[in-house]
């Protein structure tokens, strides 16, 4: 079981709604995935229509909808989108996305942290999409985010866990769920993330653009379940299993430690 804020999920596969060829195919694939948390971009929803082509089918699934602020380029724009989503969809959950660079869609760390602080104070359950930066993820946790969503590689790239070493540090130090988001292009990538210790993954492009999105959604479902079972079973020691502390050294060692230097300064202060 995975708990985020006040909600418990039995599925660790979260899914998106973009790039599907039709709402009907999207709905069928999402059902096959078993996902219980589905994200949707507010910019793609017609809030004036009670029968929106995206929103109406999603409501049939009986899952938690996670509106995202994709398209926002500043903290102010993201905060506005989150407030709009809360009013229109009656939810205080939001996936915080701020990426001003339209070429690579990399998240803006400064604006993301600014927006997260405001939204948390306003009572939102904030799940921020962010770079695989252990320091930033810790700061987002400290301001009250319910989870962190570091990228595996750029959105839609299908490159997998190119940030693996940093993801490991984030997972090791995080006290909130870690959801690997972006770049997961194959079920094997999702399995790897769960084996690494991630609490969940979010997948969109790899499912939506597959030759058979329904079959691919089911494949991701099985991969995530397998990855979680393998982690719980206890993976044996190997260079590919960083959960075993003796197999991989990630902690930094300074080439010029300041310990002695700082001690001398302290002694001089007391003289």
UniProtKB/Swiss-Prot annotation:
The keyword Transferase applies. It is found in: Cytoplasm. InterPro entries: Aldolase_TIM, Thiazole_synthase_ThiG, ThiG. GO terms for cellular component: cytoplasm. One of its GO terms (molecular function) is thiazole synthase activity. Its EC number is 2.8.1.10. It catalyses: [ThiS sulfur-carrier protein]-C-terminal-Gly-aminoethanethioate + 2-iminoacetate + 1-deoxy-D-xylulose 5-phosphate = [ThiS sulfur-carrier protein]-C-terminal Gly-Gly + 2-[(2R,5Z)-2-carboxy-4-methylthiazol-5(2H)-ylidene]ethyl phosphate + 2 H2O + H(+). The active site is at 95 (schiff-base intermediate with dxp). Pathway: Cofactor biosynthesis; thiamine diphosphate biosynthesis. 1-deoxy-D-xylulose 5-phosphate binds at residues 156, 182-183, 204-205. Keywords: Cytoplasm, Schiff base, Thiamine biosynthesis, Transferase. The keyword Calcium does not apply. It is an enzyme of class 2 (transferase). One of its GO terms (biological process) is thiamine diphosphate biosynthetic process. Catalyzes the rearrangement of 1-deoxy-D-xylulose 5-phosphate (DXP) to produce the thiazole phosphate moiety of thiamine. Sulfur is provided by the thiocarboxylate moiety of the carrier protein ThiS. In vitro, sulfur can be provided by H(2)S. Homotetramer. Forms heterodimers with either ThiH or ThiS. Belongs to the ThiG family. This is Thiazole synthase. The gene is thiG.
